[in-house]
């Protein structure tokens, strides 16, 4: 019932497109969900470390490139999870580095129910350096050439889990920044709604559909991702987004604690009229289960 409602919700926003981005649109979003849904910090494993690299729209000058590193640890004695996040993203002339600390509290509501609250706090470091080519030989003072900026950042999230189903709401970049000059870079608030359900077939096979809605109330992205775990060491999946995007992935588990995955995505619509741009993602994770 819950999944049916969410699939209907996807169709309502299937015609909405995105035009720009401050936050990355990950294909393997469940691997970095601590970033946008801090309530999930330390919720599944005793220890979990993830490195994810994303190269978006290969062939496009100034394309977005992102590296995300995160770690989480479960503190079962105090029903909590702690961790940290480091992200660096380059788009055009700008580079933004984000360093965050994560905390979540896990409230048990029953044998199979868990309600979690979490937050990320940290700093955003912006570096902007441009080499403009104006139409005249005279320098244009309205074009910024270089800027360094540091801002405090705070995120919040809440998540409910019942057996194999979970749903969560996350909010990033909650703090407002005051403009000190005409070139001040401000971070827009982003809101996330995520849900998933894990179907088990025997001891090894699993089918997990996931839905993620991401918006800053200017644009909306709705991503449907379906993962099929064939056995203890191999999985594959498909994904689609309302922003004219299709993708596929493969991944393998090895040495019992490691996962290595790769995904490729293709974008349709206006950007494809220029050229065939593809996006690649690679993820490596290490987990020690409960």
Where are these regions (language model features)?
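N-terminal signal peptide c-region/cleavage motif recognized by signal peptidases
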Residues: 15-17
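Subset of outer-membrane beta-barrel
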Residues: 21-290
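Sec-dependent signal peptide recognition
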Residues: 2-9
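Hydrophobic alpha-helical membrane-interaction elements
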Residues: 11-13
């Amino acid at each position: 019932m819950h999944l049916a409602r969410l699939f209907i919700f996807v169709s309502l926003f299937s015609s909405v497109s995105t035009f720009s981005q401050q936050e990355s649109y990950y294909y393997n979003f469940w691997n970095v969900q601590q970033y946008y849904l801090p309530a999930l910090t330390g919720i599944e494993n005793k220890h979990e470390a993830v490195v994810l690299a994303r190269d978006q729209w290969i062939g496009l000058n100034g394309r977005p490139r992102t590296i995300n590193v995160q770690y989480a640890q479960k503190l079962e004695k105090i029903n909590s999870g702690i961790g940290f996040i480091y992200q660096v993203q380059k788009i055009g002339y700008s580079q933004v580095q984000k360093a965050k600390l994560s905390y979540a509290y896990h409230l048990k509501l029953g044998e199979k129910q868990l309600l979690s609250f979490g937050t990320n706090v940290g700093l955003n470091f912006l570096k902007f350096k441009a080499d403009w080519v104006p139409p005249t030989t005279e320098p244009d003072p309205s074009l910024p050439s270089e800027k360094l900026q540091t801002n405090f950042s705070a995120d919040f999230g809440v998540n409910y889990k019942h057996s194999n189903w979970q749903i969560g709401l996350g909010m990033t970049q909650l703090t407002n920044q005051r403009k000190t000059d005409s070139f001040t870079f401000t971070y827009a608030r982003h809101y996330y709604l995520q849900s998933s359900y894990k179907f088990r077939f025997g001891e090894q096979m699993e089918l997990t559909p996931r839905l993620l809605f991401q918006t800053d109330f200017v644009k909306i992205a709705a991503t449907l991702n379906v993962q099929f775990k064939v056995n203890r060491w191999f999985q594959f999946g498909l994904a689609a987004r309302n922003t004219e995007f299709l993708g596929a992935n493969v991944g393998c588990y090895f040495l019992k604690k490691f996962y290595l995955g790769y995904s490729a995505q293709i974008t349709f619509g206006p950007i494809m009229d220029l050229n065939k741009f593809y996006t690649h993602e690679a993820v490596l994770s290490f987990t020690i289960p409960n």
